[in-house]
Amino acid sequence: MLLNQYRKPLRIGVGGPVGSGKTALLEVLCKRMKDSYQLAVVTNDIYTKEDQRILIDANALSADRIVGVETGGCPHTAIREDASMNLLAVEELISKFNNLDIIFIESGGDNLSATFSPELSDLNLYVIDVAAGDKIPRKGGPGITRSDFLIINKIDLAEYVGASLEIMNRDTNLMRKGLPWSFTNLKTGHGVQSVVDFILRQRLYLQ
């Protein structure tokens, strides 16, 4: 849910199931936006800082702008019921870089019911992937129906898993009821600009 009062930096939660492409999305977004905006990232993993390492190795941003949080428990608890570890990571980044425009907060892989605390994020992006099957949009859940922007990733795999993009398009429009979403292929960049454009529009709106 969009906040009425803009907090600088804009905090964007990125959620979705394991393997849907959250980290890959952040890599692409950071590389596309970092020349024009001051960015930072907080990643969440249960027992490791693997997603932090992936983003650093990919040169998504400089290493000091990417903070890894080991939640040690259920992924949605760390972004919803007790977001204290993530809030601390956000505050540390703000203290270190006083000119940040956007902080992305990537949740650990979770189910379709995961949501971010409004204390933690101003906008929520949710990532699912075609490889999970064309039934996923109609399963619903807050990530599908209420996220500010839904990304349906890995469209290049549709033919290999027997998923119909036409069915996913129909069901997503029904479930989203006018809220924005996009198909993406993060390997080719297909659909990424629509995500960037949405972020920038909301940033202006919330100022």
UniProtKB/Swiss-Prot annotation:
Protein's GO biological process: urea catabolic process
Keywords: Chaperone, Cytoplasm, GTP-binding, Nickel insertion, Nucleotide-binding
Transmembrane segments annotated in the record for this chain: none
Primary localization: cytoplasm
Gene3D superfamilies found in the cross-reference section: P-loop containing nucleotide triphosphate hydrolases
Binding annotation for GTP: G16, P17, V18, G19, S20, G21, K22, T23
Pfam families with a match to the protein in the record: cobW
One term of GO molecular function: GTP binding
InterPro entries in alphabetical order: CobW/HypB/UreG_nucleotide-bd, P-loop_NTPase, UreG
Chain coiled-coil ranges: none
Superkingdom field: Bacteria
Gene Ontology CC: cytoplasm
Localization, UniProt: Cytoplasm
Function summary: Facilitates the functional incorporation of the urease nickel metallocenter. This process requires GTP hydrolysis, probably effectuated by UreG.
Quaternary context: Homodimer. UreD, UreF and UreG form a complex that acts as a GTP-hydrolysis-dependent molecular chaperone, activating the urease apoprotein by helping to assemble the nickel containing metallocenter of UreC. The UreE protein probably delivers the nickel.
Family designation: Belongs to the SIMIBI class G3E GTPase family. UreG subfamily.
NCBIfam families named among the record's database cross-references: ureG
Listed name of the protein: Urease accessory protein UreG
Gene behind the chain: ureG
